[in-house]
């Protein structure tokens, strides 16, 4: 299974449903739901850390390339006629560089996934109260409350 935001959203759409006829089972299912999404959170967190390191490596590689300090073989395959020395100009080239931009987008995507899963985990932590309130409401409607 590939981990992407869409698949997590689809998974949560199913898992977020509470079966009103089996509230006791829903209550017992809370720890496994928490474990499932916490495992996802940890996996994505580690993937983000790896992507951060890749971004640093790409930034260094592209800095070397734009400053003319990269391995000469690289310029044979992909010539770059300039040697950037100015800090501001270098920053502009790095920001506009496709490889560097893609690594930033990847990290932003992981951040979006992490925020989404954090919100899921908060809902799961509150699920006990939701189930308790549902039971109390059912008792009230039945004239027992």
Model-derived regions: residue spans:
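Charge-rich amphipathic alpha-helical interaction elements
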Residues: 1-145
């Amino acid at each position: 299974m590939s981990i992407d935001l869409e698949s997590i959203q689809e998974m949560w759409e199913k898992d977020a449903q509470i079966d009103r006829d089996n509230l006791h089972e829903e209550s017992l299912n809370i720890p496994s739901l928490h474990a499932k999404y916490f495992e996802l959170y940890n996996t994505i967190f580690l993937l983000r850390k790896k992507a951060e390191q890749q971004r640093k490596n790409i930034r260094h590689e592209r800095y070397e390339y734009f400053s003319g300090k990269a391995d000469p073989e690289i310029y044979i395959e992909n010539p770059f006629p300039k040697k950037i020395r100015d800090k501001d100009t270098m920053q502009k080239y790095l920001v506009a560089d496709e490889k560097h931009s893609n690594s930033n987008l990847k990290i932003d995507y992981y951040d979006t996934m992490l925020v989404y899963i954090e919100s899921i985990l908060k809902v799961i932590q509150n699920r006990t109260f939701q189930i308790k309130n549902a039971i109390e409401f059912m008792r009230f409607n039945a004239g027992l409350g």
